[in-house]
Each structure stands twice: as structure tokens, then as C-alpha cells.
Amino acid sequence: MNNKKTFHEVSEIWCDAKRPIVKHSTLCAYQLTLQTHLLPRFGAAENITEKDVQQFVIDKCTSGLARKTVRDIVAVLKSVIKYGNKHGIFHFEEWEIEYPTQTENKLPPTLSLNHQRILMRHLLEQPTPQNIGVLLALCTGMRIGEVCALKWEDVDFAQKTIIVKHTVDRIYNCELKSTERVYSSPKTKNSDREIPISKQLLQALKMVRKQSQSPYVVGTSTQSKEPRSYRDYFGRLLKRLDIPHLVFHGLRHTFATRCIESQCDYKTVSVILGHSNVATTLNLYVHPNLNQKKRCIDRMSNFLGIT
């Protein structure tokens, strides 16, 4: 390679190539990953070996980062280097990277059934422009960015459905060195979806619609709610109701968990959540307990018909 460049130089060219292709929020995420994790380690490198990447992975995992987070970082690293290799400015050979096994498989944080009932009773008794977003997340599994970006025009009262087609988030722009609010399409193509509205949620939405002057379902402003400030509101609400702390995304986990517990089929739950595939839903929410395993074995034994 006559025109060899450093990883830092290649990453800048790669970002420029990605700019017209990916969402602005995605590009900002790439740049933040590069700035925070990759450039400090590999910025000056003109060659990155499998051994280098393997040690990087071990260091990141042992520092406390989740294995999925480290995989995502390595995916950006690989994409930059492969781009450099394609254009003859950086050498690349395929890696076989091993990731340290996780010692425990943590279940997603959820509300207990009792705490969910307490919260839902409060939300249904007081359907306000502030409370409705929490109820939306509990009854549909929508992400906080989708909840805050939801407009009344996306709620079909006649068909009793919600169309999820936007999300809002405040992201860090590495070029501006400041945060900015970004509206965009949802996380993946599967995230653009239609969700049926339950009877309880429909009634609450109608009551909020009567008093709302905002184009957005959540809040009273002409602009959407900031996800960060809405998380703070949710935290205060839980404290007021004497419910243990839960991150807002735990409402999505709670919705999915209750769907699985009530024996909804996995494919339908996956589509409602906007997951890219059923495997994501299964890995996150389907964790059979011992009694369920015993019933499975008993059914199989009975099916054989051998006494």
C-alpha cells in the first residue's frame, strides 16, 4: 500500500463517506464511539492485528462495559478498517475475536405485577398530558423517544391504533461539541409499526385529547417532550407512589414480560415491540422457570405414550 494512512485519518474519510448514507443520529453515535473508545487506542496505528483487537476487547469487557456494547464498538472499528482496505489505504485481515463469557444473565428490569397495578390505577385515574406517556409505554412497549415524538395525527381513534414512525432524542454532536435534539425515523425498519390500542389506553387518550392544545400526545408544549426531562418526571412519579426505582425503559420490558406471561405468541410480541427478529425477543424475555421446564418434559413424555 503506497498511500498508507493512520486509523484516525481513515476514520475521518469513513465518516465523510457515511454522512449522506446514514441518519444524522447514527453518524453522531459513530463519531462518539470513535472519539471515546477507538481513537485513544488505535488513532496513530497504521496496522491493527487480531491480537491488538483481542486485547482491546478483553480490556473493555474487564473495565465493566457490557459485551454487547463492546461488540458494537468493534463493529465500528471493523467497518472503518474494511473501508480503508477496500480503498487501499489500510491493511485488513479477517479476525476471529473471542468475547469473555458473562458470569450472569441479568433479566431486564421490570415492575412487579403489584407495582404495575398501582401505577396503572394512578395513571388511569389521572389521565393528564404528563401521565399519558407513562401509560403509553406500559400498554404498548414504545421506547421513550417514540413516546415523546408521538403526535395526535399518529393516533387513529377510529381504527384504535397507533402508528409509530418518529423518535426524538438528544444526542452529542462531536463536531459541534454540544448536544442537539434530533427527530428521526425509529431505531430500525421494523420499529416503524402499527400498534393496537387497549380499551383502558383508548379511554385515557380520548380524555387527554380533549384538554390538549399540543400537536404532541405527551406534554402541553408546541415542541415534543425532552426524553431526559420525561425520565426525571417518571422517577419522581414512582417516588410519589412509593414504587421502587425503575428506568423508563423498564416499562417496555414490563410490557413485554406481561405479554409473554399471558402466553401471547412470540412473533406477535416481537412485531409490537419493533424488534428486528424474534430471536431478540426470545433472548430478552423468554426465561422458563423450573415448573415450566417440568411441564415441557411431562408433555413430551405423555406424547410418546410409553407407560
Report the location of each language-model feature:
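N-terminal core-binding DNA-recognition domain of tyrosine site-specific recombinases/integrases
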Residues: 3-8, 15-83, 87-89, 105, ...
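Active-site/catalytic core of tyrosine-dependent DNA strand-transfer enzymes
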Residues: 32, 196-244
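Phosphate-coordinating loops and pocket residues in cytosolic domains that bind phosphorylated ligands
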Residues: 50, 58, 113, 121, ...
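Basic, Lys/Arg- and aromatic-enriched nucleic-acid-binding interface segment
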Residues: 67, 71, 86, 90-91, ...
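C-terminal catalytic core of tyrosine-transesterase DNA break-rejoin enzymes
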Residues: 68, 86, 135, 139-146, ...
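Proline-centered turn/helix-capping motifs that create local helix->coil transitions or kinks
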Residues: 84-94, 157, 166-174, 207-214, ...
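C-terminal secondary-structure termini that scaffold catalytic or DNA-interacting sites
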Residues: 159, 170-174, 178-192, 199-201, ...
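Catalytic-site neighborhood detector that most strongly recognizes the C-terminal catalytic loop/helix
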Residues: 168, 273-299
